Amino acid sequence: DASELAAQMVSGDLDIALVPANLASILYQKTKQGVEVIDINTLGVLYVAAADDSIQSIADLKGKTLYMTGKGTTPDYVLQYLLSANGMTSDDLTIEYKSEAAEVAAVLKEQTDAIGLLPQPFVTVAMAQNENLKMVLNLTEEWEKTQPENGSALVTGVTVCRKDVLEDQADAVDTF
């Protein structure tokens, strides 16, 4: 659980952690700039899954209900950005937030017309439970459509390290 990792990083009980990208900035503030991002460990991995073949772009989500996790987390920020880049806001669709990806997968299994935003491997699990479900939008591809000039990547996970550990044990961190 990312919140447990965050608490351990803030308290100094944990030296290095792999965390969602948005959590790195929170840790940076909570530790008074006491952590650094040392690498990007996850790019992309976010998908919109549905049985509805008519969903072929972000704009096709208009007027629909989308199930997803984590209000105020990386998937939410990505969605909000993509909506804005496509001339939309969250008011153009209904977003139902669930507390974890397994809950979104359960909705997709129970409601055959549901649409969900899930990371891997949860989208694959959901598809295994509902044979009509497919990945209709790859959010990495949607992100890249908004970034043709600068090649920005959709970063979803990073590794953070306490600065004192980085300074005092540089060889160990390099080995990590």
Per-range role (PLM):
Residues 4-5, 102-104:
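Short acidic active-site motifs
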Residues 1-97, 112-120, 131-139:
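Short, glycine-/small- and polar/acidic-enriched structural segments
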Residues 22-23, 103-176:
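Pocket-lining segment of extracytoplasmic ligand-binding domains
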